[in-house]
C-alpha cells in the first residue's frame, strides 16, 4: 500500500477521523466551503498539482462568518502552507507548577519543534492530535511552515542554552509531505550545525539522512513508538504506520550502526492489549537491538474520552468493552486506566524489561496523593516516574544540557550536568543546582527568553 493508500481503505466499523478529513477535502464536486479542484504549477513541487480554495475556522464546525479562505494543496493529501512556524520551546510544564496542575514528569530538558502541524496522516485511533477541536487540528488539514529550516536556524542563532531537539512530539517527522518540503530534515540539520543533539519520534520508516544525522552527536538517539505485538491490532490502532516486521528490521539496522534506540510503548490500551502481549513486544524489541522502553497507559481529556471508548468498542468488540471497564480513573482532569491495574502492570513490566536487558521508564504516569493511612489527599496526581525508572533519564539516553557564550561558537555539553537532568538536580543536592545556574535549577517550562541566556556554571 502507498503512503496514503490506507486513507481510502476500511479500518474498522468506526469512522476514522483521518479518513473523514481526507475524504471531505478530496471530494471531487465543489460545495459550500470548497471550491472546484484545479491544476496549478507550483515551484516547490516543480509541476502542476491539484489545489482548491477552502474556508476554514479555528474551531471545528465554525460558522461561516468565522472562516477564512485559504489555498489547499491536495497532494499527497490536503495541506496548507503557513508563513510563521511555531516558536521553539522547552516542555510545556516546569518544576514549580500550580498544585492544581499535574507536575512535570520529564527528568531532563528538550527543545520542542513542529515541522508540520494540524492533522496527522498516521491516523492513530487514540491520538489527541486528530481529535483536537481548536486551531489547525480542528480543521482536518496539515499545516506546512514554509522555509522551516531557515526559521529554526534564526532562532537557534539567538540561543545560548540548549538541549536535544525533539523532532517531533506532534505529527510524525517522516510523513509523506517530508519528501516534498524536507522540514524535518532541514530542522535537524540546523540543530546539528550548531552542535546540539537531536532525536526523532516516529511510527514511519527512518530515512537514511536521519540515521546519518543521528551519528553526528553521541547524545543523539532514535525513538520509535509502538504499543502492541499483534500486527492486526497494530493496523487497527495505527493504520498509517510502518508494519511491525519492518519496524523491528529498522531497529536492527540502526542498532548495528551504533545508534541508541529508545522505544515509546505508548499508549498501552489495557483490555485491548494485555500485559502478556507487552512483554512479548519487549522480547521482540530486545532481540532487534533496542536499548530502552518507555511505557504509558492511555489517557484522554473528558471531552473526547467517550468517543475513544466508542471507537475502541467498534474496532475491538468485547476487548473494547473490557477497556471501557478499566478506563475509569480521573486523575489531574484526565481519564485514564484504573490506578491499581497500572501500578501492578508497571511492577511486572519493569521486571521483564530488566530481565531482557532493557532499561525502563514511564511517561506521564501518576497516582493519587495519599497520607500514610492510604486516605486520598489530592486527585491532581503525583508522578511515579522516579519509582519505576531504571535509567538515569526517562528517555533512556543520558543527554546533558548544552550552552555557549556567543552565536559564533558551537554549543557544548555542560560538564557537571547530573545524569538525571534538571528536574531533580537541586532537590537532590541540598537545594543547589550542580552546575550553579539558578534557572537550570528551577527547571522551568523554557521559552525563547530563557533559551537566550547562557548557563552560568560555577
Which role does the model predict for each range below?
Residues 2-64, 68, 279-458:
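Auxiliary Fe-S-binding modules of radical SAM enzymes
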Residues 13, 29-32, 49, 143, ...:
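Short coil/turn linker and secondary-structure boundary residues
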Residues 34, 38-82, 161-169, 173, ...:
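Short secondary-structure boundary segments
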Residues 69-223, 231-232, 253, 439-458:
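Conserved Radical SAM active-site core
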Residues 147-337:
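Conserved AdoMet/S-adenosylmethionine-binding subsite of the radical SAM
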Amino acid at each position: 500500500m502507498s503512503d496514503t493508500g490506507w486513507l481510502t481503505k476500511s479500518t474498522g466499523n468506526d469512522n476514522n477521523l483521518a479518513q473523514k478529513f481526507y475524504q471531505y477535502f478530496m471530494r471531487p464536486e465543489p460545495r459550500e466551503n470548497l471550491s472546484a479542484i484545479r491544476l496549478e504549477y507550483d515551484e516547490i513541487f516543480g509541476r502542476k498539482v491539484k489545489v482548491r480554495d477552502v474556508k476554514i475556522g479555528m474551531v471545528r464546525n465554525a460558522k461561516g462568518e468565522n472562516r477564512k479562505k485559504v489555498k489547499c494543496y491536495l497532494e499527497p493529501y490536503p495541506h496548507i502552507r503557513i508563513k510563521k512556524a511555531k516558536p521553539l520551546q522547552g516542555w510545556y510544564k516546569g518544576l514549580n507548577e500550580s498544585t492544581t496542575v499535574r507536575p512535570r514528569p520529564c527528568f531532563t530538558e528538550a527543545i520542542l519543534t513542529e515541522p508540520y502541524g494540524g492533522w496527522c496522516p498516521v491516523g492513530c485511533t487514540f491520538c489527541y492530535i486528530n481529535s483536537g477541536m481548536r486551531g489547525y487540528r480542528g480543521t482536518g488539514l496539515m499545516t506546512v511552515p514554509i522555509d522551516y529550516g531557515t526559521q529554526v536556524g534564526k532562532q537557534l542563532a539567538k540561543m545560548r542554552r540548549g538541549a536535544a531537539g525533539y523532532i517531533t512530539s506532534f505529527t510524525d517527522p517522516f510523513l509523506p509531505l517530508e519528501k516534498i518540503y524536507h522540514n524535518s530534515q532541514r530542522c535537524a540539520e540546523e540543530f546539528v550545525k550548531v552542535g546540539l543533539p537531536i532525536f526523532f519520534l516516529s511510527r514511519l520508516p527512518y530515512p537514511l539522512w536521519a540515521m546519518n544525522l543521528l551519528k553526528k552527536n553521541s547524545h543523539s538517539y532514535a525513538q520509535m513508538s509502538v504499543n502492541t505485538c499483534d500486527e492486526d491490532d497494530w493496523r487497527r490502532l495505527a493504520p498509517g504506520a510502518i508494519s511491525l516486521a519492518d519496524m523491528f528490521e529498522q531497529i536492527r539496522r540502526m542498532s548495528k550502526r551504533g545508534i541508541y534506540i529508545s522505544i515509546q510503548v505508548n499508549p498501552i490500551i489495557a483490555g485491548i492489549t494485555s500485559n502478556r502481549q507487552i512483554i512479548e513486544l519487549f522480547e521482540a524489541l530486545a532481540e532487534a537491538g533496542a536499548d530502552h522502553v518507555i511505557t504509558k497507559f492511555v489517557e484522554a481529556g473528558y471531552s473526547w474520552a467517550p468517543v475513544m471508548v466508542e471507537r475502541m468498542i467498534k474496532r475491538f468488540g468485547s476487548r473494547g468493552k473490557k477497556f471501557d471497564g478499566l478506563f475509569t480513573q480521573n486523575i489531574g482532569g484526565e481519564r485514564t486506566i484504573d490506578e491499581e491495574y497500572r501500578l501492578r502492570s508497571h511492577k511486572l513490566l519493569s521486571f521483564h524489561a530488566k530481565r531482557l536487558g532493557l532499561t525502563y521508564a514511564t511517561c506521564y504516569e501518576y497516582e493519587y496523593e495519599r497520607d500514610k493511612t492510604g486516605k486520598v489527599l489530592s486527585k491532581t496526581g503525583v508522578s511515579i516516574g522516579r519509582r519505576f525508572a531504571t535509567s538515569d533519564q526517562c528517555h533512556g539516553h543520558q543527554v546533558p544540557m548544552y550552552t555557549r557564550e556567543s552565536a559564533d561558537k558551537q554549543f557544548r555539553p555542560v560538564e557537571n550536568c547530573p545524569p538525571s537532568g534538571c528536574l531533580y538536580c537541586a532537590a537532590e543536592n541540598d537545594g543547589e543546582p550542580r552546575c550553579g545556574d539558578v534557572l537550570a535549577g528551577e527547571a522551568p517550562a523554557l521559552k525563547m527568553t530563557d533559551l537566550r541566556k547562557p548557563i552560568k556554571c560555577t
